[in-house]
Amino acid sequence: MDRVRILFLPGVDADNTNAQSLNVREIALRLDPGRFQSTLWYEHDPDPRLRDRPAIRLLKLPSHGKTWTIFREMLSGYDIIAYMDYSPASYLFLHLPHSARSPAQAVFHAEAPSAQFVNPSTVLRFLYGGTFPRCDVYTAITEFVARDVCNNIKKRVNFILPVGVDTKAFTPPAEREHDSPVVLFVGTVIERKGPQHLIDAAGRFPNAFFRIVGAGREGFSGVLRQRVEQSGLKNISLDGPKTQPEMLEIMRESDIFILPSRLEGIPKVTLEAAATGLPCIVFRDYETPSVIDGVTGFQAGTVEEIMQALERLIADPSLRGRMGAAARKHMEKFDWDFVSRQWQSAYLEIAAKPVR
């Protein structure tokens, strides 16, 4: 039987910490090489794990003409084009008649479609509206996100495919001993992700230390730095972006993980934090299965409930230990070696689906 040919659209450069890029690498590395041939893009230096793999083809994007390079490759007879985005190349491809793009099935992997509309850019809204509703197959990482797809682009989700974590790489430290508990936020430093709440928490809990890790956008890092300086707080730091190895060490050096964002799917950072044995605090708005409320952490409904959860964990090392151990155990069902089998089964079914 011929192998299923898949073109993944996210770039896989080694220094790319975007969640979609990280997910694509883990999936491609685990697809059965006897049944799949994966093609992936990079700009400068691809993840070294992807090199010299018999079933993985790496393509370097040129510095100019990227849209046409990607568009031409999309027309090269793939069975599946995975992780459809809202780039001009995807827009052009999806506006071709099915006969022109056959046999490719365009697959939209949904994380939280409504999150895209937070961006006020008219161009991005135009591209989003002209791409995602035209895909052939829809997957979602949770039931909540599947409902979001139905509500926002009026499409039925064909598969629920969670994302995973490498539990062999993300492991707890031998012990956690700090005079002051370390509370960690990891994510894009924008208002929607909620890092500003850590400044409020730092003022409320002076016996804990708070770390904000991640790249800033929309000038929000500067806003937060100004707030910290004006407050005179000494128990909080804004550490900027970090590499994956650095992130792992930071998680091992922390005691509590917090992501006060209202709009997510399965936040990858909660999987990584839980795998390193951290209890996690999140909002319950998006019903993430990565945190079991009261067992591996807390799902809160309000900012005040976030603060109450923090207060409990900061004050009780035993509770942190129990929840952290439960979080690590919970991550077994999110290990990429297990989760990738679901992706492989879905891709085989998608490839066998007749083109409309």
Q: Which residues does each PLM region occupy?
A:
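A conserved mid-protein helix/loop that constitutes part of the nucleotide-sugar donor-binding site
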Residues: 19-26, 181, 185-204
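Glycosyltransferase donor-sugar binding loop
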Residues: 41-45, 165, 186, 209-223, ...
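Short His-centered aromatic/hydrophobic patch
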Residues: 83-89, 110
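Membrane-proximal helix-turn-helix segments that form the acceptor-binding/catalytic region
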Residues: 121-138
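Short alpha-helical donor nucleotide-sugar binding micro-motif in glycosyltransferases
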Residues: 241-242, 249-254
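Aromatic "clamp/platform" in nucleotide-sugar-dependent glycosyltransferases that forms part
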Residues: 262
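Short hydrophobic beta-strand element within catalytic cores of glycosyltransferases
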Residues: 270, 279-282
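Conserved acidic donor-binding segment of nucleotide-sugar-dependent glycosyltransferases
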Residues: 293-304, 312-317
